[in-house]
Every structure is written in structure tokens, then in C-alpha cells.
């Protein structure tokens, strides 16, 4: 294994996983394809068909009585889920023009999920509602650019209205309520997340993993989180969550940039010999060193991830020191006698597990001595007592202390089958993201109620022309669709109930419809709440993409390749004086 690693590294500048890297002697090969084009009404109609198809699949999951979607998978059992972004990502349409529209909605769902962590189904419903009305108005002769300006004007007014009426959450009960709503009414998940947040605090770290028992478990362990992610997406081990997850890895820390293969070759060989993943945290990892890591990962020879060290200057040095104490490793810098290319097993640290995303890294159950970790915390507290420190320096020290001394809550999802565990895990992750969003920006009345009340504010917005007025009207109608969809999924008359809500309780912001008890109530009192961040992000993302699609005048896709006709049968030989038959 060691010699194989070494020999593979020597060929790095030439090839990575069978792909030629452009170099001094590389000759780029350009391949062209024929294109199909559609214009005007035809283009927008095809996009709308794709948007509508995907939105219908996603919208059935919205609300406490939304339905599940069954998704076939290339490997393993079919997936059962109510997670909007999972449903959206699984859709691929045969018609390429329609698939363009579906892919744009997938981008909306993915972006909303990335920013807010929840609300993807609402964003999808809003995208369809805004785009369908925009297409209808453009077909009637309206100026698409003015419609877009009107839509953006209305969205700005709605966001301003929602921010003025949001409220902060402070109690564990409110956190449980937000989580319960996001988990489709599962009070067990709500209580579990509230308990986890109570254990580690609102700024604490909570992660979700698959458990090995039938019941769910909550475990609080020592660990650290810092805001640096993987350098390259080639390191990802879980494609769905876009994460790198390792168990019992070795950890290499360096204060300097790592570029040469020789710098990390001993550490790669040590990890290969012990059959353990390797985590490299350095000022930067690039050049042949990065290529070596990627090549070994892609070939399956070694699980490895490279991460930039957190912080800058002296703060980076201190944080690497904290990581060294936590993981029982050495930091390779000018102060150590041994250079990184001569790393020995005792120079590498370890931990129970590590999770790396595009933006941050979580290290759990470091192998460092508890006494040394506590001594390091006391040392930081001693430095903080210096009266000559600036506010910035105190803030950074407090941040280091919180990372080093704070625990990490791990929710282990249990179940009797893989399908059940995955479905429940999706709901817990959504609920966790909703709770984080609620804590950061506050909450609003749920079930689409805040959008319905905001729609009543859009009647008197001044605009420059009639087409912009129609753009405002598009948003006014569209933002009532989430509430209507939630009601329709529960088997109720969505239009009728939303109309009554506007007419009877238009001026009472917190009054909404309780589906469980079939009556109008104060949603704050019964705990039906939506995070402002989720609602706001979904509306902004949906309106931006939908109004932009409305300005489309031409759509271009790859033309299908023409299949070559099979050769005809050979002619029959002549008989006697007769000619052959063809």
C-alpha cells in the first residue's frame, strides 16, 4: 500500500481519476453539439410545464397533513419522504425544455435550503404561483421587465411588513413548538430538539446522525466547531448532505501552507497503514499536495480531507494550539524541531468523529487529556482578565473559550428499518434548521398566515405604470397560495377559508386557522409558528427566479443525437440467368 501511494503521487501532474489536467503540453479538445431552440410563448410554455410538474410533486408534502412521496433509487430501498428539497432534487424530466424549468425550481429549493435550512416546499409553491401569473400576463402583452420591477417592489414591502411584526423566541417551549411544526406535528422531535438546545445553549452545536437502536437518543459530548470547510468538493463522502463524515480519523495540524507532496506523504502512509481517515488542517493546501489527496480519495485508496485553518495571524496560531490540545496532536511550525515531512505517529492527533461541510467543521470526542483541556481553558480565562485588552481581543478569546469548553449535542436517530430512519432523520434535520432560523431572526404566525395578512397591505403601493401594478398584483395573489395549499392538503376548501381569514381577521396579525380543531385561533397561543428567516428567504428566492424566468424570450438545449439507421439486409444472389434481388 505504501509503495502504491508513493508511485501514484509521482504521476499526479498528469492525471486525476482518468481525467487529463490541462498542462504545458495538453491540447484541449473542443466538442460541439447541435442545439434546439424555442422562442417567445413556446419557450415560456415549456418552462411553465416543467415548473408545474415539479411543483405538483413537491407541494403535496406541505403542511401537517401533507402526503409522503415515494422515490425510486438506483441502489437500496425506495425512499419515503416529506422533505421538499429531497423530492425536488429527485425530479428529472424527459423533455429538455421542460427540464430547464424544473431545474430552475430545484435551484430555488436548494438555495432556500442552504440559507434557511427549511421552507423549500413553500418556496417551490411560491415560484410556481408567481411564474404562472407572469407567463399569463406576458402572453397578454405586458412588458416583462415592468412586471419584474413590480414583483420586486411588492416583495420588498412584504419583507418589511414581516420584519416589523416578528417576535423573538426565548423559552424551551417555544423552541419545541417551532421544531414540532417543522417536523410535521411530531411532538417527540420538538421536545428532543428543545432538550438538546437546553443542554448546549442557543449558540451550541447540535448534529444529527443515524443511530443503531430502535429509539432516538440524545448524547452530549466534548467537541469543537470552527468556520472553515473542505477545500475541495472532491472530498465529499455523503453526496446528499454534501458533507465529509469520518469516524476515528488521524489529524495533521500545520501552521504553514502545504504544497509539496513530500510534506504530507509520511502522514498519508501512516493513515494507510492504520486504515484510518486523515484530516489535514493547515494554512492552506494546494498544488501537488492537494492533488495527491484528491487522487487517493477518488481511487478509494485513502479517506482524506483538507481544511484551511481557522482564524488569521496570531488568532490562527492560538486556535491551532487549541485544536492540538483537544486532539492530542502537534502543530508543525517554526517552533517545533521536527519538520512536517518527517511526521511520526505521535505527531498526529485523533478524535471520535469529524464532520466537514462547505462552511464549517465539527470535531467530536478529541483524544486530548481532559486535564490539559481544562488547563488550556484556565489559561484563556487568565488572559481575558488583562484590563489592557481591546474589545476585539476579548471577543476572540471568548470565542475560543466557548469553542473549547462547550459541548456538542448529538441526536442519534433510531428506527426499525433504514427507510424509517432516513425519513425521520430528514424531518429532524428540517426541524433543527427551523429552530436555528427562529432563534436567529424570530418567528411569525405559521400555516402561511403571515403571508395572507401581508397580502392585504399590497393594495395601495404606488407604481410607475400599469404593468408594474400588475406585478404587485401577481405577488398579492401568489403569497396566499402556501396557506391555500396547506388547507387543500388537509382536505379543506383553501380559497374559502383564506377568504374568510382576510374578511374577518385581516387586522389581527396572529389570528389564523387551526386545521386540527377546524377553527380560527391565535396561532401564537397554540404554538403554530414559522421562522421569519425561512419565510423571508423562500419569498425572496422564489420571486427572484420566477420573475427572471418571465423575461425569457429564448430557450436553448442540446438537440437529441440522431440514431444511425441499421444497415439493410444484403441482396439475394441471382438464380440461373435471373438478376439478383435487392
From Swiss-Prot:
Residues 561-582 are annotated as: Disordered. GO terms for cellular component: mitochondrial inner membrane; mitochondrial intermembrane space; mitochondrial matrix; mitochondrial nucleoid; mitochondrion; post-mRNA release spliceosomal complex. Residues 1-35 form a transit peptide. The modification Phosphoserine is found at residues 77, 92. Transmembrane segments: none annotated. Residues 570-582 have a biased composition (Gly residues). Gene3D superfamilies: GroEL, GroEL-like equatorial domain, TCP-1-like chaperonin intermediate domain. It comes from the Eukaryota. CDD domains: GroEL. Keywords: ATP-binding, Chaperone, Mitochondrion, Nucleotide-binding, Phosphoprotein, Stress response, Transit peptide. GO terms for molecular function: ATP binding; ATP hydrolysis activity; ATP-dependent protein folding chaperone; protein folding chaperone; protein-folding chaperone binding. It is found in: Mitochondrion. The keyword Protein biosynthesis does not apply. May participate in assembly and/or disassembly of proteins imported into the mitochondrion. HSP60 are ATPases and have affinity for unfolded proteins. Belongs to the chaperonin (HSP60) family. This is Heat shock protein 60, mitochondrial. The gene is hsp60.
Amino acid at each position: 500500500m505504501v509503495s502504491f501511494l508513493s508511485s501514484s503521487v509521482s504521476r499526479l501532474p498528469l492525471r486525476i481519476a482518468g481525467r487529463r489536467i490541462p498542462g504545458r503540453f495538453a491540447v484541449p479538445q473542443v466538442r460541439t453539439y447541435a442545439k434546439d431552440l424555442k422562442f417567445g410563448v413556446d419557450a415560456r410554455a415549456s418552462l411553465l410545464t416543467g415548473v408545474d410538474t415539479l411543483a405538483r410533486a413537491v407541494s403535496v408534502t406541505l403542511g401537517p397533513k401533507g402526503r409522503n412521496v415515494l422515490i425510486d433509487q438506483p441502489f437500496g430501498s425506495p425512499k419515503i419522504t416529506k422533505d421538499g428539497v429531497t423530492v425536488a432534487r429527485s425530479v428529472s424530466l424527459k423533455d429538455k425544455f421542460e427540464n430547464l424549468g424544473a431545474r430552475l425550481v430545484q435551484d430555488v429549493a436548494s438555495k432556500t435550503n442552504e440559507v434557511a435550512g427549511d421552507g423549500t416546499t413553500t418556496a417551490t409553491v411560491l415560484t410556481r404561483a408567481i411564474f404562472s401569473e407572469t407567463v399569463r400576463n406576458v402572453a397578454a402583452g405586458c412588458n416583462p421587465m415592468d412586471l419584474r420591477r413590480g414583483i420586486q417592489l411588492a416583495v420588498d414591502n412584504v419583507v418589511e411588513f414581516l420584519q416589523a411584526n416578528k417576535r423573538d423566541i426565548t423559552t424551551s417551549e417555544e423552541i419545541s413548538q417551532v421544531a414540532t411544526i417543522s417536523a410535521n406535528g411530531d411532538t417527540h422531535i420538538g421536545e428532543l430538539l428543545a432538550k438538546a438546545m437546553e443542554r448546549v445553549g442557543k449558540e451550541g452545536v447540535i448534529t444529527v446522525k443515524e443511530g443503531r437502536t430502535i429509539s432516538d437518543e440524545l448524547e452530549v459530548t466534548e467537541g469543537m466547531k470552527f468556520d472553515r470547510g473542505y477545500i475541495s468538493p472532491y472530498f465529499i463522502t455523503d453526496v446528499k448532505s454534501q458533507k465529509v463524515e469520518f469516524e476515528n480519523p488521524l489529524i495533521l495540524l500545520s501552521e504553514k501552507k502545504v504544497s509539496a507532496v513530500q510534506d504530507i506523504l509520511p502522514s498519508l502512509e501512516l493513515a494507510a497503514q492504520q486504515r484510518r481517515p486523515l484530516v489535514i488542517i493547515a494554512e492552506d493546501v494546494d498544488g501537488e499536495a492537494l492533488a495527491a489527496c484528491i487522487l487517493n480519495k477518488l481511487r478509494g485508496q485513502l479517506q482524506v480531507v483538507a481544511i484551511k485553518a481557522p482564524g488569521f495571524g496570531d488568532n490562527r496560531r492560538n486556535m491551532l494550539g487549541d485544536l492540538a490540545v483537544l486532539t492530542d496532536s502537534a502543530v508543525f511550525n517554526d517552533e517545533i524541531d521536527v519538520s512536517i515531512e518527517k511526521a511520526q505517529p505521535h505527531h498526529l492527533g485523533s478524535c471520535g468523529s469529524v464532520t466537514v461541510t462547505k462552511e464549517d467543521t465539527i470535531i467530536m470526542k478529541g483524544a486530548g487529556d481532559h486535564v490539559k483541556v481544562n488547563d488550556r481553558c484556565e489559561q484563556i480565562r487568565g488572559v481575558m482578565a488583562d484590563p489592557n485588552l481591546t474589545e476585539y481581543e476579548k471577543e476572540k478569546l471568548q470565542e475560543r473559550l466557548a469553542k473549547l469548553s462547550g459541548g456538542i449535542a448529538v441526536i442519534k436517530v433510531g428506527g426499525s428499518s433504514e427507510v424509517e430512519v432516513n425519513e425521520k432523520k430528514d424531518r429532524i434535520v428540517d426541524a433543527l434548521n427551523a429552530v436555528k432560523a427562529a432563534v436567529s431572526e424570530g418567528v411569525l404566525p405559521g400555516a402561511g398566515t403571515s403571508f395572507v395578512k401581508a397580502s392585504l397591505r399590497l393594495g395601495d403601493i404606488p407604481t410607475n405604470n400599469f404593468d408594474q401594478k400588475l406585478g404587485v398584483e401577481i405577488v398579492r395573489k401568489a403569497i396566499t397560495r402556501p396557506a391555500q395549499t396547506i388547507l387543500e392538503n388537509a382536505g379543506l376548501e383553501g380559497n374559502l377559508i383564506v377568504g374568510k381569514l382576510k374578511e374577518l381577521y385581516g387586522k389581527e396579525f396572529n389570528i389564523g386557522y387551526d386545521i386540527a380543531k377546524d377553527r380560527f385561533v391565535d396561532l401564537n397561543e397554540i404554538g403554530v409558528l414559522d421562522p421569519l428567516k425561512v419565510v423571508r428567504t423562500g419569498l425572496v428566492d422564489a420571486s427572484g427566479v420566477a420573475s427572471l424566468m418571465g423575461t425569457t424570450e429564448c430557450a436553448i438545449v442540446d438537440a437529441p443525437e440522431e440514431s444511425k439507421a441499421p444497415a439493410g439486409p444484403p441482396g439475394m444472389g441471382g438464380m440461373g440467368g435471373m438478376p439478383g434481388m435487392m
